[in-house]
Amino acid sequence: MKILLAVVFVLNLTNLAVPQHLITSSPSLPESKPVGRRPTYEEYKQQRESFLQTEDHHLLGANVTLTENEQLVNKFIMQMKLDEMEKGFNDSYNFIPARHIFEVLDRFGQSKVFNVIRRLPKGGVLHAHDMALGSTDLIVNATYLENLWQKGNFGLNHGPEFKFSRERPGKEWSLVSEIRQWMTNEVYDAKVAEVFSLYNADPLNAYKSLDNVWSKFQNLFACLAPLITFAPVWRQYYHDSLKQFYDDHVQYLEFRGVLPEVYDLDGKVYSAEEIVQLYYEETEQFKAKYPDFIGVKFIYAPGRYASDEEFQKLLDTTNRLHKKFPNFLAGFDLVGQEDPGRSLFEFAPALLKLPASINFFFHAGETNWYGMKTDQNLVDAVLLGTKRIGHGFAVLKHPKVLKEIKRRQICIEINPISNQVLKLVQDQRNHPAALLFSDNYPVVVSSDDPSFGRSTPLSHDFYVAFTGIASAKQDWRWLKQLALNSIEYSAMNSEEKTVAKEKWNQAWDHQFSRLAVDFVAGKILENWIMKIV
């Protein structure tokens, strides 16, 4: 009986009218195509060679032509580079760019490639910050000056307060000169160097997260400010920082500055205009002393935590500086940790009211997040008309931004060591800049805050980018292209760029002639030693 009912039910269903719009035709299978033959091995090899050649033609530096001396040096340096990379390929733990820089700082000097890069004229640094330009030694030197007072002790994660004053600021303050007497200069210097650095011998355990290291970073600035913003120190620190960049064969600098309150013993607090005037005067004096130095431009870059009311005051300052220093002021940016900070979209209504003659150089995408307000700063930076992008670490997650960067020639300022120290990347071989290097994007390599990582103004960053991020195939043409890019994508006008290229070319040709002689002499000596051993 149950079987009979089931049959009747099914028969009834077949008589139901099904609405025509619910009837879908079965997807047709694709027509089978004749199976082609596989290529022969010789054909495969030809296709492979053509494929790789096409990739090579897209590499950053592929369009650079080397002189005879450069070709000679290139041959030697590529032998050195490939030797280091081959050793790293067989033992990646001992490959410098694969490790945290704090773990291998003492090994850079053992690298032949690094020692050559140190001698290389690297053009300019387009991404650096005012209170992190010079080495920690410059800060230590400042603590020997008279009238410096200290409040509190050196802690594990914080430092004492400092202040220059003719009179004792309060009962809890002590003269640093007196503290040095009972602590000894050697011990005190070591304490200062430790406080004003992010360096830690065990960085992976010392800094568990990006927020941990940013917290130390911000505490460092808070402790440093009253010490370094004393007017005589501020001036000397800037001058000595320029000398350190110059000694690292950096001929040009564009740096961001927050314009903090600079003060003197008479109680004067310098205005924004007076601080920029100080920068300008010191720069001109430095250029007069070192004629092959190209120059400096300043990017006003206050913090991104400002309220709407505070932000308007910052823009008013920007307008005043632009009018008084139309050539020395390169433009405007916002600094500070992006993730907790306000987004560019929030500031856009006010930013769009600035005159078009004020250029933007926005930090954007300094984050590991995707689809959040931080990486979307990249979109806003492009739409706001930024001339360059600071870091752009998340740019690979935004393909349209990548297209616009190429179309508009928006340069990305890559800071590999800073990205590692601030926990964005652990192994430089995984740095997203590898893609930018592989397809000739507009890029420069800079150093961000070299002093806090105990690295050189640019050589350490160039080295890890050259051996760890760039292709094993990328050679001196890559290095030369980066140096040229630092001039091309700078804020200099066309006349200034012409002069800059002349000065850089002279330095480059001179160094390459010396390197060629040294390499040939070294090779002859090596062969002679091999014969007598």
From Swiss-Prot:
- Its signal peptide is 1-19
| GO MF, one annotated term | metal ion binding
Q: What is its EC number?
A: 3.5.4.4
Tissues/organs with expression: Female salivary gland (at protein level).
Keyword field: Hydrolase, Metal-binding, Nucleotide metabolism, Secreted, Signal
Q: What is its main location?
A: secreted
- Show the GO cellular component annotation of the record: extracellular space
For this protein, the record's Gene3D superfamilies field holds: Metal-dependent hydrolases (3.20.20.140)
User: Which one GO biological process term can you cite for this protein?
Assistant: adenosine catabolic process
Location comes to: Secreted
Tagged with keyword Ion transport: no
Up-regulation conditions: Up-regulated in salivary glands by blood feeding (at protein level).
PTM comment = Proteolytically cleaved by human mast cell tryptase and chymase.
Q: List the disulfide bonds.
A: none
Enumerate the catalysed reactions. Answer: adenosine + H2O + H(+) = inosine + NH4(+); 2'-deoxyadenosine + H2O + H(+) = 2'-deoxyinosine + NH4(+)
Entry cofactors: Zn(2+)
Q: Per the similarity annotation, which family is this?
A: Belongs to the metallo-dependent hydrolases superfamily. Adenosine and AMP deaminases family. ADGF subfamily.
Q: What does this protein do?
A: Catalyzes the deamination of adenosine to inosine and deoxyadenosine to deoxyinosine. Induces degranulation of host mast cells, and secretion of tryptase and IL6. Modulates enzymatic activities of human tryptase and chymase. Induces release of cytokines, such as IL1B, IL6, TNF, CCL2, IFN-beta (INFB1) and ISG15, from host monocytes and macrophages. Activates host NF-kappa-B signaling pathway in TAK1/MAP3K7-dependent manner.
UniProt miscellaneous comment: Antibodies against the protein are found in the serum of individuals exposed to Aedes albopictus bites.
The protein in question is named Adenosine deaminase
